[in-house]
Amino acid sequence: MHYERILLKLSGEALMGNRQYGIDPERLAEYAAEIKSVVDKGVEVAIVIGGGNIFRGVAGASRGMDRVQGDHMGMLATVINGLALQSALEDANIQTRLQSAIKINEVAEPFIRRKAIRHLEKGRVVIFGGGTGNPYFTTDSAAVLRAIEIKADVILKGTRVDGIYTSDPEKNKEATKFDFITFEDVIKKGLKVMDTTAFTLSQENELPIIVFDMNKPGNLLKVATGERVGTKVNL
């Protein structure tokens, strides 16, 4: 087993499947099966999920909404997604705990680092909702922060493309994929992996990031067990 403890970052949009908005139950079930395959191998799994399938604070601000208010709405969206994923995982017989960075005690535990680590040690999947609990920070930043706090070995960023390319492969067929790239080269080449705050935090704490296609069955297990899938970013 290559990694003992991973943090999986999923975007809210990933939960939409082929829909334009909201949550696709079939996609949720697929992701739950992928996560179960990793848990069954003894890997400790934490998850941070975005809220863009429901609401984005930045989008609200661009239409005149107060940015802080919008970000708070986005945080609540991540909790909704967390509850949906928790339900799907529990349907797959995986013990799961949802912790929130904002107090919402009726539906989620408050984020307590030691408690989160204890859940992981007991084989439970821990979903972190509510972002960082602060406006102006993305869920990418929340993912890196939580990964550092729980001492994860790696951040696995599940996307709809199979790694990092020289340019957007959905727009440029000539784009080529990197198997490995350094943090420094990502910055030099102006490649978009995460927002700058999240990426810098990961670099400073020497926390590797692997970007991979979450929608290809079996990929999560391959990445977690050390197979070369996607693009690895490290020092």
Swiss-Prot record:
Keywords: ATP-binding, Cytoplasm, Kinase, Nucleotide-binding, Pyrimidine biosynthesis, Transferase
RNA-binding as UniProt keyword: no
Binding sites annotated in the UniProt record for ATP: 9-12, 52, 56, 159, 165, 168
InterPro entries for the chain: AceGlu_kinase-like_sf, Asp/Glu/Uridylate_kinase, Uridylate_kinase, Uridylate_kinase_bac
Record-level GO cellular component terms: cytoplasm
Domain of life: Bacteria
GO biological process: 'de novo' CTP biosynthetic process; UDP biosynthetic process
Pathway terms, separated by semicolons: Pyrimidine metabolism; CTP biosynthesis via de novo pathway; UDP from UMP (UMPK route): step 1/1
One MF term in the entry's GO annotations: ATP binding
PANTHER family in UniProt: URIDYLATE KINASE (PTHR42833), URIDYLATE KINASE PUMPKIN, CHLOROPLASTIC (PTHR42833:SF4)
Protein name as it appears in the record: Uridylate kinase
The species this protein was found in: Christiangramia forsetii (strain DSM 17595 / CGMCC 1.15422 / KT0803) (Gramella forsetii)
Lineage start: Bacteria, Pseudomonadati, Bacteroidota, Flavobacteriia, Flavobacteriales
Gene behind this protein: pyrH
